[in-house]
A protein has these predicted regions:
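Core alpha/beta structural scaffold of self-assembling particle/tube/pore-forming proteins
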Residues: 2-58, 84-373
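N-terminal low-complexity, intrinsically disordered segments
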Residues: 57-81
Length: 373
């Protein structure tokens, strides 16, 4: 019996909608997919428009005052509002099947489902790796309109030769080797309130723990009770720490040395391990991110330098945003006159990362980056 192209399209479309669990294993590249989880879970935001925009008040002008009876007033209006502007980044993948593959498996339910699911899973895996890779790096340059704004774009290291902790993270180190201070449309070089907290460390010891304590304390801003909090806090635990394997190992070793009994408590007093062995710092989980294993920057002399960074991210203020109606959109199976026996499904989406408050979004602690000799 002849099977028409339209029947094959319908078969592919209806099967793809409700694939059962596959009977094959995948050799994953990454141990964790933190960015992907944020994009797929309740922490993501949904937005529309030609770009992602938010307003932010960066400073005040000291107009409040105590007054005496019958004092005169001098009302003024100050322009302290700035606009955060983040472009959309488009991402996509595709998966294809030849008519002969489909025909050879159409009488075997298991074979047909494995054919469809394995092809889709391989491409979804590729998509996840790309999202994760770019989520832990800055774009190629200040004019790069292809890649999203990864975590290092918003949470910057101290400048070369700087070691004093504070809200001094202002220089974006782009993947292509250039630098800049304009972050999401606002110049951190001119606006000191549009900078993140950064500090340096030498060894993994009590001095580093003190540095972490101070960073946590200084980035936890609480508004006065009579001022409405404009943040977008969501459910669940929004704060996590991230590091590469070398630093995670050293922090776990430090935790073991601090508590021989290995009883479940906090690293600032005793060790607290979760099921996969990562420690907690001030009740904040420390997660291993394989992309940070190979993170390097250029020092003052232009040489590659490994900062071995510890990132802390508050996902209430550094938000993953997807475009309304255009995220993980799967097309109908399509054919092309140049490959008339091939059916292709396209998966597309539009997203980026948005930081609404760089002072509250987290911090980074890294090895001092050498200045130019």
């Amino acid at each position: 019996m002849k099977v028409t192209a339209s029947q094959l399209v319908d078969l592919l479309a209806t099967t793809l909608e409700d694939l059962p669990k596959g009977q094959f294993e995948v050799m994953w590249d990454s141990q964790n997919y933190k960015i992907c989880r944020i994009l797929q879970e309740h922490r993501r935001q949904i937005d529309g428009g030609t770009s992602i925009q938010r307003n932010v008040i960066l400073d005040r002008n000291g107009r409040a005052r105590y007054r005496r009876l019958f004092d005169t007033d001098s009302p003024t209006v100050d322009q302290n509002m700035k606009t955060i502007d983040v472009p959309w980044a488009q991402i996509g993948t595709d998966y294809s099947w030849d008519v002969l593959e489909i025909m050879r498996n159409r009488n075997s339910e298991k074979g047909f489902i494995n054919l469809l699911e394995s092809r889709r899973t391989e491409r979804m895996w590729d998509l996840a790796e790309l999202i994760e890779e770019r989520g832990w790096s800055a774009p190629e340059s200040a004019t790069d309109s292809l890649y999203p704004y990864g975590i290092p774009y918003y949470i910057n290291f101290l400048n070369d030769g700087e070691t004093e902790a504070g809200f001094s993270g202002r220089t974006i180190r782009y993947s292509g080797g250039t630098t800049g201070t304009i972050c999401a449309g606002i110049d951190a070089g001119a606006e000191d309130k549009w900078r993140n907290y950064a500090a340096t460390r030498t060894n993994v010891d009590n001095a580093m723990l003190r540095t972490i304590r101070q960073a946590i304390r200084r980035t936890r801003f609480r508004p006065p009770p009579f001022v409405q909090n404009p943040g977008q806090d969501g459910p669940g635990t929004p704060i996590e720490m991230y590091a590469g394997d070398v630093l995670v190992n050293e922090l776990e070793d430090l935790a073991d040395r601090r508590d021989d009994n290995n009883t479940p408590d906090d690293l600032m007093g005793k060790v607290l391990h979760n099921y996969d062995g990562a420690v907690y710092i001030n009740r904040i989980p420390l997660c291993y991110v394989p992309q940070l294993d190979t993170q390097t920057v250029l020092d003052g002399d232009g040489n590659e330098f490994s900062p071995e960074a510890l990132y802390c991210v508050d996902w209430s203020y550094l938000q993953a945003v997807v475009q309304d109606g255009y995220w993980m959109e799967e097309s109908e199976p399509q054919t092309d006159r140049g490959q008339h026996t091939t059916f292709t499904v396209f998966l597309d989406g539009s997203h980026n990362n948005l930081c609404i408050n760089r002072r509250r979004a987290g911090f980074v602690i890294h090895k001092p980056i050498p200045a130019a000799a």
